[in-house]
Amino acid sequence: MARPARLPAQSHPADRPRPGEPWTDDPYAHALRTGRGPLFMRRLRPPVDRDDAGGEGELLPLDVERWCAAPDAADTGVLQRCAGPVLDVGCGPGRLVAALTAEGVPALGVDVSPAAVARTRQRGGAAVRRSVFDRLPGEGRWGTILLMDGNLGIGGDPLVLLARLRTVVPPGGRLLVEAAPHDVDERLTVRVEDAHGRHGRPFPWARLGATALLHTAEAVGWILTGRWADEGRSFVELHRPRSRQHDERASAGGRTEQP
């Protein structure tokens, strides 16, 4: 994600509509329908004590226009590493699913946002509305999982997310992940917000740079097979090992956390 930004002066709280569900009934859905921002993820400050409700913190811009455009050069480098069938977790408006489908690579997008699923289908891709922590189509048979555009933060606990994704690919399957461009390792509470201060409800999120990502991935049994940067973005390629013994050790190590 880009550097923190500042919003214009906000309207009075009494003038704002009631916050909707994250990603489904908030400014994100409107931005996907129009293909335009500005849109932000606002970091919420934790409460100082039990009587403090916390407050508003820095803004992290969300690159809606890029998500709604055709794949760029950095995206294309990722797509060239895909072995079908491909599952795009948090597919957003579906640029990657649509591009793979156009090349004849079987691909499916998964997203909790109805607007994201609808836009993916409009672009000619297949998508289902579902959480990654729910039962997914074709579990254990996907050749590649994509986790792009900051979606490593889904659920707020990357250890749990990466452990879950190991169950979605077979031994030898791969995971292509976009890490934060900076060396960060944080768990936070955020909300999606537009330039007018309209926002959805808070939800847990996480941000990991490549170093923290690799430590977390190793802890749940993924093996590093590639790492690169392109157009200011950072990417990692991981594989689920083919060794059954390695899988058993990883399962034992990640058994304490549940989504």
Residue ranges of each PLM-predicted region?
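S-adenosyl-L-methionine
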Residues: 1-81
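Conserved SAM/SAH-binding beta-strand->alpha-helix loop
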Residues: 113
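Conserved SAM-binding strand-loop segment of SAM-dependent methyltransferases
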Residues: 124-134
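Short alpha-helix
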Residues: 203-221
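A short glycine-rich, Lys/Arg-flanked "PGG" loop and its adjoining helix->strand segment in the class I
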Residues: 159-171
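Conserved class I S-adenosyl-L-methionine
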Residues: 83-92
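A short SAM/SAH-binding and catalytic strip from SAM-dependent methyltransferases
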Residues: 142-159
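Conserved beta-strand signature within the Rossmann-like core of class I S-adenosyl-L-methionine
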Residues: 172-180
